[in-house]
Amino acid sequence: MIENRPWLTIFSHTMLILGIAVILFPLYVAFVAATLDKQAVYAAPMTLIPGTHLLENIHNIWVNGVGTNSAPFWRMLLNSFVMAFSITLGKITVSMLSAFAIVWFRFPLRNLFFWMIFITLMLPVEVRIFPTVEVIANLKMLDSYAGLTLPLMASAIATFLFRQFFMTLPDELVEAARIDGASPMRFFCDIVFPLSKTNLAALFVITFIYGWNQYLWPLLIITDVDLGTTVAGIKGMIATGEGTTEWNSVMAAMLLTLIPPVVIVLVMQRAFVRGLVDSEK
């Protein structure tokens, strides 16, 4: 029997409340700043009571963009969505098919190919990113959705996770499919894919947020303002030198940028947790 200790319960709940406050307070300050005008934001100290300029600030960046030479913010949101969704579908497709081939097909050096994929995790981003930019430039894919998404569609982690899951599937499934005359792709579509739905949900959430939060890659690949993404666009709103940053517009843009990943997490929360739990079994 677990002994009930009131002081321990009080302490744990106090720490939980403090942790939540530490996380939510910066978000609340950002929300308040997004509701104020420029003068109120620069007042010292800035008020913590929400103002009435939220819709005005959102409309300003939605129509006029986040800077003097930028696309409207709705365009940046669209670009970020296209990038995140394309990367997500690409990662899932490439990772599932490569893991399926490594596990279920018998061909020479298949384990070597897997470890060659897996060893890329040991390479820092700084080592990989500039050669990748050089390849994209040589292929004439700068300032394009293809250059923005294709290099990020390969994932060693996703391939590893799917490989580990596929290795837990019983061999009897393969034998039954062979007896029924199913081709490898029929076996993949009718048996392997449905059994992988929980893992797919978890990977979808993780990969979408990964693609949505990309900052360095779009900054290196994109110079066309009409192809800019939200995260890079917000960075462009912060003035350097003698310029003045309109923090109310920056915070309004940040709030809009938070909405899509938050919606994805809330909608797929149960499937995401189930996918993480099932992948550990």
From Swiss-Prot:
InterPro entries reported in the protein's UniProt record: MetI-like, MetI-like_sf
Subcellular localization(s) per the UniProt record: Cell inner membrane
Transmembrane regions: 16-36, 85-105, 113-133, 142-162, 202-222, 247-267
Pfam families: BPD_transp_1
Bilayer topology: Multi-pass membrane protein
Gene Ontology CC annotation, any one: plasma membrane
Top-level taxon of origin: Bacteria
Coiled-coil intervals, chain numbering: none
Main localization (coarse): membrane
Residue intervals of the ABC transmembrane type-1 domain: 77-268
GO BP of this protein: transmembrane transport
Signal peptide: none
Keyword vocabulary terms for this entry: Cell inner membrane, Cell membrane, Membrane, Transmembrane, Transmembrane helix, Transport
SUPFAM superfamilies in alphabetical order: MetI-like
Subunit structure, as described in the record: The complex is composed of two ATP-binding proteins (UgpC), two transmembrane proteins (UgpA and UgpE) and a solute-binding protein (UgpB).
Function, in words: Part of the ABC transporter complex UgpBAEC involved in sn-glycerol-3-phosphate (G3P) import. Probably responsible for the translocation of the substrate across the membrane.
Family statement: Belongs to the binding-protein-dependent transport system permease family. UgpAE subfamily.
Protein name: sn-glycerol-3-phosphate transport system permease protein UgpE
Species of origin: Shigella flexneri serotype 5b (strain 8401)
